[in-house]
């Protein structure tokens, strides 16, 4: 998904702007040194204390998320997510939205998940896109948007860790659409043996229905 507009990290200019402000305060308004000293306190707070606090909150959230997701406590996860105001506002937005998309997907709220993953991709770094695109394609598959899902699966990088799973999904799409049915069935029957429980269930359902 192509990013729109110029992407600027405004935080890089904070220190130069602060130095300019200090220059103006000292030479323009004859501010005492103690005022300048207080003014500079934000630098260690913003660049040291704030990242440490953010990392602590994020680590705790990730552990709680993994634990509850494994327990299939999706309603509890949604409540946990909504209570994370600090992380939703100041944390890694693409990762936060990606986790919300996973919650919606697990709850069967695929339209909400689709919108959430698309929003996450708008904010994602290049290194995060593969996982988000794969999850988005899975949601589109569940919504019956097979052409969109197929296009995303095929666009994944050759060295993507999701490449094999994407091949399984493409075989499912072929089966659903009645294309290369024998080849798709053969591939899915082999893939089923080493598939995770959710994928195995998806394969079984497709084989039974098609």
Can you name each region flagged by the protein language model?
Residues 71, 107, 143, 177-178:
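Structural motif corresponding to the intra-repeat A-B loop/turn of tetratricopeptide repeats
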Residues 45-72:
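Transmembrane-cytosolic junction motif
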Residues 89-93, 125-131, 160-169, 193-205:
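Boundary/linker segments of alpha-helical solenoid repeat arrays
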Residues 77, 113, 149, 183-184:
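Single-residue signature of alpha-solenoid repeat helices
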Residues 63, 98-99, 135, 168-169, ...:
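"A position-specific structural signal for the A-helix of alpha-solenoid helical repeats
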Residues 74, 110, 146, 180-181:
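TPR-repeat structural position
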């Amino acid at each position: 998904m192509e990013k729109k507009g110029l992407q600027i990290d405004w935080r890089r200019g904070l220190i130069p702007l602060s130095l300019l402000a200090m220059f103006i305060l000292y030479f323009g308004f004859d501010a005492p040194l103690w005022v300048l000293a207080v003014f500079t306190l934000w630098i260690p707070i913003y660049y040291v204390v704030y990242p440490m606090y953010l990392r602590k909150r994020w680590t705790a959230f990730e552990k709680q998320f993994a634990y509850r997701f494994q327990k299939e406590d999706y309603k509890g996860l949604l409540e946990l997510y909504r209570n994370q105001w600090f992380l939703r506002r100041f944390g890694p937005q693409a990762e936060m939205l990606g986790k919300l998309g996973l919650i919606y997907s697990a709850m069967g709220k695929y339209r909400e998940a689709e919108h959430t993953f698309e929003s996450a991709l708008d904010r994602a770094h290049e290194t995060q896109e593969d996982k988000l695109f794969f999850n988005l394609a899975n949601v589109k598959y569940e919504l019956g948007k097979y052409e969109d899902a197929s296009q995303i699966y095929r666009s994944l990088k050759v060295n993507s860790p999701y490449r094999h799973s994407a091949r399984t999904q493409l075989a499912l799409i072929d089966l659903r659409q009645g294309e290369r049915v024998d080849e798709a069935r053969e591939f899915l029957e082999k893939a089923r043996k080493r598939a995770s429980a959710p994928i195995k269930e998806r394969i079984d359902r497709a084989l039974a229905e098609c």
